[in-house]
Design a protein with these regions (language model features):
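A mid-sequence, solvent-exposed acidic-amphipathic segment
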Residues: 186-235
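Short, well-ordered secondary-structure micro-motifs
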Residues: 157-159, 200-204, 238-240, 273
Length: 296
């Protein structure tokens, strides 16, 4: 890898400033480039970004590792859906091969004791390829573009009782762009997701649907990001429709390695199915979200 490639790899990660990245526009580098999301992939909370995870190693092209693999990064999440009495923990790890191919893994444990299932185990394996670099072709407006997929497996008595599928595969395309011409830098990211998930895979998998997702983040200070995230609810057959997901989040880039995140998420009516037998706009309630992210 030559110096230009290494600089390009860094600049792409820096461009994720407002979604928990380093901020070239303000001349200060902080951790989280991007986050490991709940499923382990490089993104924010629910959604992926077009930027790949993991920083280059020190030493530039003189370090042979930069021709092979990035540094790893890790993220841990705690989701407290208090109104539904659901506790949700997640841990993810990711790195990038050849400055372009991201590989990720994630594990999630959901305790939904109120609904009779204290141990919902979710396993995720992901890959993402950055097809187009941000500001490619010597422009200032071309977004980074990536495609990716995540294999998901859910081990749960609830899945078995509802006769849904335990595993499935999500595919997505996403574009992300940092806008620096505004008074405060703004990151815009949007994509399409082909998924069979039922309640974010907490309840398993069914038929496939194509839905949209998006993020917007603003950086009012060099070490603080404030943003919103949205994921459209998928219609996955048999009358099942997931509720749209929303969250508002604040991230503090503590230093080059550590990022702390707090958020509030709304996933939809937690009791719709149990009260009315309706499978439309299914969700698992709302609550607070906290995350610790570490990047070597």
């Amino acid at each position: 890898m030559n110096n230009n490639n290494i600089k390009n790899s860094k600049s792409i990660r820096v461009a994720a400033a407002l979604s928990f990245a380093a901020v070239a526009a303000l001349g200060t580098a902080y951790g989280g480039v991007p986050l490991n999301n709940l499923q382990g992939a490089g993104g924010i909370a629910f959604n992926p970004l077009a930027y790949t995870a993991g920083q280059p190693w020190e030493g530039g092209e003189s370090n042979s590792l930069n021709n092979v693999v990035s540094k790893p990064q890790f993220g841990a999440w705690y989701v407290n859906l208090n109104d539904a009495d659901i506790n949700w923990g997640a841990f993810g790890a990711a790195f990038t091969v050849a400055s372009r191919l991201e590989l990720s893994a994630g594990y999630e444990l959901v305790n939904a004791r109120k609904y009779g299932d204290r141990s919902i185990n979710k396993y995720n394996l992901g890959a993402k390829v950055r097809l187009l670099d941000e500001n490619a072709f010597d422009t200032s407006w071309v977004p980074a573009i990536a495609v990716g997929g995540i294999y998901k497996y859910t081990d749960s008595r609830t899945v078995d009782a509802l006769k849904l599928d335990n595993d499935g595969f999500d595919a997505y395309v996403v574009a992300s762009k940092l806008i620096t011409q505004t008074p405060w830098p703004i990151l815009l990211s949007a994509g399409l997701l082909y998924t069979d998930e039922v309640v974010n895979v907490v309840v398993g998998h069914n038929d496939y649907d194509l839905v949209a997702f998006g993020n917007i983040d603003v950086l009012p200070a060099s070490n603080v990001a404030i943003g919103l995230e949205y994921k459209q609810g998928a219609r996955v057959g048999d009358g099942i429709r997931n509720h749209d997901y929303y969250d508002g989040h604040v991230a503090w880039f503590v230093n080059d390695n550590l990022t702390l995140v707090a958020a509030y998420v709304q996933t939809g009516d937690k009791d719709k199915f149990y009260r009315h037998g309706s499978a439309k706009n299914l969700g698992v309630g709302s609550g607070l979200v906290f995350s610790v992210q570490y990047q070597f």
